[in-house]
Design a protein with these regions (language model features):
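C-terminal substrate-binding subdomain of Rossmann-fold SDR/epimerase-dehydratase oxidoreductases
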Residues: 2-6, 43, 48-58, 64, ...
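N-terminal Rossmann-like NAD(P)+-binding domain of SDR-like oxidoreductases, especially those catalyzing
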Residues: 2-215, 265, 269, 336-338, ...
Length: 373
């Protein structure tokens, strides 16, 4: 079920705008990079519920990583219901970006794609910069040139920023807080942020930066610390795992629910003027606090299972991130709905169910219970 030419995957809804025409007369059309990721899947659901037609750009390798959007899938041959469509493209391939902009003719473009793992960015800094920083520049230039060629100046662009850009700057961090990135990923996000500001000021693009603080969900990748914890809690509770290896337990983060945060992305593009916004819960918690809630929720003591592994410490740590989202709350009318403990318990519940299904396969001999490396 991969993308072929125009489409071969599609999502639920009713009606379908013409892919080669300006579909704004029928409904709004959104183009999303990173659609198979955590944020992309929640944003797709949100926009479909708003009546949008959603187009996602995916890489060839994404064919094996579509589980977050599989539940939205509808056979594209059912044109009356299919409103999510996937196309092959890559932020490292400028020609593919411009080609799909010309074909899809979206009203809104959401750039969510990235090599988004901070620790991994130290291992592959060149690739991280190419996708996160230069990739954003390629997409901005594709939007600018598309507008110049077609006159479709109403297109709106959203750039996914990150609280990691603030790095070692003391909290609380707002839109006016200086950036001090502490990783190749964060530095690349800073470049993408300023490219977006530059295209807004130089070319008049309606381009917004969303500086989103950490946002989690049951769809979070398992190599991120929050999901790594809740996945382990589920497996330990079910008897598939005994130990969890982590790094810095005193790192403090402002954690929110990804489903809440994608609404803020959309809200930014509904304003009369483009601007940049911090999106955060304005509460911070340490990794240790996350452990206490997650393990305590299932009646376990995290100290009996967690071991420190120096491999998971970053070369340059970011100690404390806590956002000041007063601007987003005042201007956009946005506020988080899911609190910290509710978020942690939501993730644990999902991972316990996942561990139960895994145990069935282990007990039947179809797979081995893999201890965390």
């Amino acid at each position: 079920m991969a993308a072929e030419n125009d489409t071969s995957r599609a999502g639920s809804g009713s009606g379908s705008a013409a892919i080669n025409g300006d579909a704004s007369a029928e409904r709004k059309v959104a183009l999303i990079t990173g659609i198979t990721g955590q944020d992309g899947s929640y944003l797709t659901e949100f926009l479909l519920n708003k009546g949008y037609e959603v187009h996602g750009l995916i890489r060839r390798s994404s064919n094996f990583n579509t589980q977050r959007i599989n539940h939205i899938y509808i056979d594209p041959h059912n044109a009356l219901k299919a409103r999510m469509k996937l196309h092959y493209a890559d932020l490292t391939d400028a020609s593919s970006l411009r080609r799909w902009l010309d074909t899809i003719r979206p009203n809104e473009v959401y750039n969510l794609a990235a090599q988004s793992h901070v620790a991994v960015s130290f291992e592959i800094p060149d690739y991280t910069a190419d996708v996160v920083a230069t990739g954003a520049l390629r997409l901005l230039e594709a939007v600018r040139s598309h507008i110049a060629a077609t006159g479709r100046s109403h297109i709106k662009y959203y750039q996914a920023g990150s609280s990691e850009m603030f790095g070692s700057t003391p909290p609380p961090q707002s839109e006016n807080t200086p950036f001090h990135p502490r990783s190749p990923y964060a530095a690349s996000k800073c470049a993408a942020h300023w490219y977006t500001v530059n295209y807004r000021e130089a070319y008049g693009l309606f381009a917004c930066n969303g500086i989103l603080f950490n946002h989690e969900s049951p769809r979070r990748g398992e190599n991120f610390v929050t999901r790594k914890i809740t996945r382990a809690v589920g497996r330990i509770k079910i008897g598939l795992q005994s130990k969890l290896f982590l790094g810095n337990l005193q790192a403090s983060r402002d954690w929110g629910f990804a489903g809440d945060y994608v609404e803020a992305m959309w809200m930014m593009l509904q304003q009369e003027k483009p601007d940049d916004y911090v999106v955060a819960t304005e509460e911070s918690h340490t990794v240790e606090e996350f452990l206490e809630v997650a393990f305590g929720y299932v009646g376990l003591n995290w100290k009996d299972h967690v071991m420190i592994d120096k491999r998971y410490f970053r070369p340059a740590e970011v100690d404390n991130l806590k956002g000041d989202s007063s601007k987003a709350r005042k201007v956009l009318g946005w506020k988080p709905r899911v609190g910290f403990e509710q978020l942690v318990k939501m993730m644990v519940d999902e991972d316990i169910e996942l561990a139960k299904r895994e145990k069935v396969l282990v007990d039947a001999g179809y797979m081995d219970a893999q201890q965390q490396p």
